[in-house]
């Protein structure tokens, strides 16, 4: 064992601390208990499999794209991937106006697998029906996409379209820095009010005008996307950015001016030698 001394102002006590011998603890289970547990596990499997049996299958997914005139392979992927949320995804596709069905498919394609499984049709419909169509290669991922970071998805797009001053929107499309300035002037930062850093919903930030830095960043991107400005939280360095043309501009809410993000290119080259086989990529 090892010795541990505890000292205080009165006395010193020496203890021998001996760890228990490593090993499993034998459990005494009767045959009746084993049988009851096996029965319970079987009942749980029956309940689970009955529920899973209601999910979409490839056969079931064939009818919907024929009815709506949408891509059958992608539709099958979405419906099967949505698991128990298939009713919401089906409702979203059925309710989408015919001229917006291609955009509806793009929206489902850009959200995560988890979002397919737990996002209500009403949230998806808000982002589809209130998205400002912009002719840009960045549109689907950085304007239409409702997902910014790890926030709870909410129907914020119609809200911001109605509440952000129209004069500001018009000017900001030409100069997105105006949205940066608005956020700096109107949103107070108080990280101590959200020690767990659970993202505040963008609409909540608008109403309270207070947020932690992470929620402020999500709010900024959500507002930009709602008014047709491509924006993101860059996934590698976590920088907040908006796009001006096809150039990404870093946002620093503490800086007076924003800087254009530097663009680079990584090239992997290989010179073969006889002593080694060529590398293979998986």
Question: Which residues are covered by each model-predicted region?
Answer:
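Long amphipathic alpha-helices with heptad-repeat character
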Residues: 40-44
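Hydrophobic/aromatic-rich core segments of domains that either
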Residues: 181, 193-280
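Short, small-residue-biased leader/transition segments that mark boundaries at the very start
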Residues: 1-6
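An almost-null, non-specific background feature
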Residues: 8, 22-24, 133, 151-153, ...
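Secondary-structure boundary elements
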Residues: 35, 47-208, 253-255
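Extracellular beta-sheet/turn segments enriched in Thr/Pro/Gly and aliphatic residues
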Residues: 7-35
């Amino acid at each position: 064992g090892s010795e541990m001394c505890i000292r205080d102002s009165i006395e010193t006590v020496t203890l021998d601390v001996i760890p228990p011998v490593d090993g499993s603890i034998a459990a005494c289970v009767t045959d009746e208990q084993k049988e009851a547990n096996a029965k319970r596990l079987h009942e749980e499997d029956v309940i689970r499999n009955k529920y899973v049996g209601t999910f979409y299958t490839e056969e079931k997914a064939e009818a919907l794209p024929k009815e709506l005139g949408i891509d059958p392979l992608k539709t099958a992927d979405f419906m099967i991937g949505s698991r128990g949320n298939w009713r919401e995804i089906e409702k979203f596709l059925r309710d989408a106006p015919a001229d917006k069905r291609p955009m509806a498919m793009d929206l489902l394609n850009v959200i995560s697998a988890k979002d397919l499984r737990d996002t209500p049709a009403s949230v998806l419909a808000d982002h589809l029906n209130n998205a400002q169509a912009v002719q840009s290669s960045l549109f689907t991922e950085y304007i239409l996409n409702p997902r910014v970071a790890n926030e709870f998805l909410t129907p914020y797009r119609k809200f911001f379209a109605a509440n952000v001053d129209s004069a500001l929107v018009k000017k900001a499309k030409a100069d997105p820095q105006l949205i940066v300035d608005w956020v700096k002037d109107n949103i107070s930062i108080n990280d101590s009010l959200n020690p767990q850093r659970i993202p505040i919903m963008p609409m909540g930030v608008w109403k309270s005008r207070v947020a932690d830095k992470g929620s402020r960043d999500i709010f900024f991107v959500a507002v930009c996307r709602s008014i047709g400005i491509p924006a993101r939280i860059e996934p590698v360095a976590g920088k907040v950015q908006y796009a001006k043309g096809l150039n990404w501009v870093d946002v620093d809410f503490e800086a007076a001016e924003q800087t254009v993000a530097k663009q680079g290119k990584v090239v992997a080259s290989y010179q073969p030698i006889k002593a080694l086989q060529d590398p293979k990529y998986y």
